[in-house]
């Protein structure tokens, strides 16, 4: 447990992100020195991958703070009835359950990326290994050292990303714990946040979805569009095609599917788990409370004629209160997010999955037509 928390500490993550940034700057300088403005020769795969990792790390450093803030706002919304000690116990219990998931996730993603390098550079690695077994040094020592550094940074970056994927899964598991606790998690019809009081946790899971959009869209763009579209791209300086693009397509597709699994665990599953709780509460209120409210409102109209002015005014106030409660029940939404936010990000959430698939399938559909 402590080990995983230390690995994901802001100092260590910030230091490693700085190393990746320096390496990326070096690659940019190297590409510019070698190719200048011959853009077709640049190593976009490496540069864009590192830039995506840096962007994700900048965002992910606020993950724990956002999670704590979402729980605090739930309590301020009166949607989560917990003391400070209860919240601490909940966090500790969730951390203990998900500790192994985080470590295994880091190992899985790191191994997956390492396996991808072995798959793509298998013959090259075998040649180097054969040369070393013959007690000889392979040629191109500096280039090999640079390649080795690139592989190490890539695998470590993948492992760190995997640890965070596990943490997203851990926070996603919290939705199941909370949604099953009907006494502590309250669904409040007509709440001012527009999401039955659950907007803070819904917004947090949306943030997790945005984080996962970075690797999903990057991997999807490369396997579904960039590699098929530009696999024959020739560098005008060397007169050689861009190397190894086609070989990366299979590994990128597998990685894309794996990250989609984390998207499901870190956003889709908890989001729908909370939606299930909201819908169950609404059905219960519509079945049990709404008919009683209707009867009381209509009965109040009959009593008003025989009441004095003071009692009539009080009866009017009571009917107004009952009407607001009935309206809030009948107009309850389904999602732990207000409608404006949901509409704003719906295209992004669908695009994470549909854009790569569309880019992959459209050329095939065009050929059939």
Where are these regions (language model features)?
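Juxtamembrane inter-helical linkers in multi-pass membrane proteins
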Residues: 73-91, 172-200, 279-307
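Generic multipass alpha-helical transmembrane bundles of integral membrane proteins
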Residues: 120-274
